[in-house]
């Protein structure tokens, strides 16, 4: 009796197991005296979907090639299920890779392409037929089993490539920007398909992309890379809401950054009920004029780096477009920064407003659109006031990101 393909090989990600499958320790890679990977350390759990995210040239594809065995590290170690992979060639590792170019065999049918790896392993014919049938059903291509790759759409070809990669039940599947050649609508569809397949099969996925939306929508964790180093490793919510530095803040999603001067730092202290508060800092936003006098002091939650902050220091306030609120400049109820609308983009459920503050700084606000609310009828060059709720911002220290 053959094992069903639908039986997870590993514990699915939803079980949140803590068992480590892949361990990268002190990895370095050097080409011609240029270090392209610098002290990479990462533990990846069984059944996890983790994304290596970063701009072109950050080292993410090089790291994937080291894991796959296509290249060897200059230093450090790679452990897969506790076994050292150093020196082991790619074809000897329980790892499969899906590339941007799917490399399907044009002279073979869809079913023959998917079965190819099983035939190389001399799996019995009856078992091959069963597993191919199950795999094609899982990727919803059973009705195309006898088609040639050139007769398929881009999304269908990609699903064939994934089916061929996972039918061998690898412990680890590596995906190098497999969605980048697809159009936007199909890319969104395939994001859902990939996550569904990963969850049902329970195979650990390491996904490489430069697309922040792909990373945020599919990943259990994201490892943000720049210049051969990890900048931050965390869940999509952690990466988006609490970026570790200015690079991550600017690279992930759309960002408004405001300079502010620290006016007071207040340490943790017990409240009236004896509970310890997180403390707070007071800042004055440096960006622009406000109505009726100087910029007010804002009372903010105490950032993680508050022990290193002194009165007079400059910090960065991170606010996403959806955090900002727009008011009439004559509104007396809300304080805020003055500016004018220089562009307005209707996107169905939201209205995006590009605003130039009085000092020339350009920011973006995104609000849910309400056609019955006259306050949404912003005209170009119309004066507005921009504000936010204290506590919605994320505070980062001043740094040089170049």
From Swiss-Prot:
- Give the stretches traversing the membrane: none
Indicate yes or no for the key word Cell inner membrane.
Answer: yes
Per its record, how is this protein called by name? Spermidine/putrescine import ATP-binding protein PotA
Q: Which family does it belong to?
A: Belongs to the ABC transporter superfamily. Spermidine/putrescine importer (TC 3.A.1.11.1) family.
Q: Which CDD domains match?
A: ABC_PotA_N
Instruction: Report quaternary structure and partners.
Output: The complex is composed of two ATP-binding proteins (PotA), two transmembrane proteins (PotB and PotC) and a solute-binding protein (PotD).
Q: Kindly give the InterPro entries that the UniProt entry links to this protein.
A: AAA+_ATPase, ABC_SmlMolc_Importer, ABC_transporter-like_ATP-bd, ABC_transporter-like_CS, Mo/tungstate-bd_C_term_dom, P-loop_NTPase, PotA-like, PotA_ATP-bd
* Key word RNA-binding present: no
One Pfam annotation reads: TOBE_2
Q: Which residues bind ATP?
A: 54-61
Q: Which NCBIfam families match?
A: potA, PRK09452.1
Functionally, this protein is described as follows: Part of the ABC transporter complex PotABCD involved in spermidine/putrescine import. Responsible for energy coupling to the transport system.
Chain coiled-coil ranges: none
Q: Where in the cell does this protein reside?
A: Cell inner membrane
GO MF entry, a single one: ABC-type putrescine transporter activity
Q: How does this protein lie in the membrane?
A: Peripheral membrane protein
GO CC aspect terms: ATP-binding cassette (ABC) transporter complex
Superkingdom field: Bacteria
E.C. code: 7.6.2.11
Which reactions does this protein catalyse?
Answer: ATP + H2O + polyamine-[polyamine-binding protein]Side 1 = ADP + phosphate + polyamineSide 2 + [polyamine-binding protein]Side 1
Question: What is the source species?
Answer: Psychrobacter cryohalolentis (strain ATCC BAA-1226 / DSM 17306 / VKM B-2378 / K5)
Question: ABC transporter domain: which residues?
Answer: 22-252
Gene name linked to the record:
potA
Question: Which keywords label this protein?
Answer: ATP-binding, Cell inner membrane, Cell membrane, Membrane, Nucleotide-binding, Translocase, Transport
């Amino acid at each position: 009796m053959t094992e069903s393909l639908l039986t997870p090989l590993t514990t699915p990600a939803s079980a949140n197991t803590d068992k480590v499958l892949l361990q990268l320790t002190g990895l370095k890679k050097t080409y011609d005296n240029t270090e392209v990977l610098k002290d990479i350390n990462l533990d990846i759990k069984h059944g996890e979907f983790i994304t290596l995210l970063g701009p072109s040239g950050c080292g993410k594809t090089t790291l994937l090639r080291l894991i796959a065995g296509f290249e060897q590290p200059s230093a450090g170690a790679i452990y897969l299920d506790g076994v050292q992979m150093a020196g082991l060639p790619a074809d000897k590792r329980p790892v499969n890779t899906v590339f941007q170019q799917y490399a399907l065999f044009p002279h073979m049918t869809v079913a023959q392409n998917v079965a190819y790896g099983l035939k190389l392993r001399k799996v019995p014919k009856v078992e091959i037929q069963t597993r191919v049938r199950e795999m094609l059903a899982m990727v919803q291509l059973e009705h195309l089993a006898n088609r040639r790759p050139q007769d398929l759409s881009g999304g269908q070809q990609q699903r064939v490539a994934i089916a061929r990669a996972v039918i061998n039940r690898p412990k680890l599947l590596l995906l190098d920007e497999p969605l980048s050649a697809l159009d936007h609508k199909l890319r969104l569809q395939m994001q859902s398909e990939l996550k569904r397949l990963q969850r049902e099969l329970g195979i650990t996925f390491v996904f490489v992309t430069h697309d922040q939306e792909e990373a945020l929508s599919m990943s259990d964790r994201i490892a943000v890379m720049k210049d051969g180093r990890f900048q931050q490793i965390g869940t999509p919510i952690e990466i988006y809401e609490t970026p570790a530095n200015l690079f991550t803040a600017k690279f992930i999603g759309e960002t408004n950054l405001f300079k502010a001067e620290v006016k007071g730092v207040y340490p943790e202290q017990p409240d009236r009920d004896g509970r310890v508060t997180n403390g707070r800092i007071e800042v004055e936003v440096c960006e622009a004029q406000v109505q009726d006098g100087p910029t007010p002091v804002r009372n903010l939650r105490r950032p993680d780096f508050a022990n290193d902050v002194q009165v007079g220091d400059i910090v960065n306030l991170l606010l996403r477009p959806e955090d900002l609120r727009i008011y009439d400049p004559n509104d007396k109820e809300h304080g805020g920064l003055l500016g004018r609308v220089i562009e307005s983009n209707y996107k169905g459920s939201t209205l995006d407003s590009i605003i130039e503050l009085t000092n020339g700084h350009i920011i973006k606000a995104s609000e849910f659109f309400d056609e019955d609310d006259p306050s949404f009828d912003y005209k170009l060059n119309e004066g507005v006031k921009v504000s936010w709720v204290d506590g919605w911002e994320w505070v980062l220290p001043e740094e040089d990101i170049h």
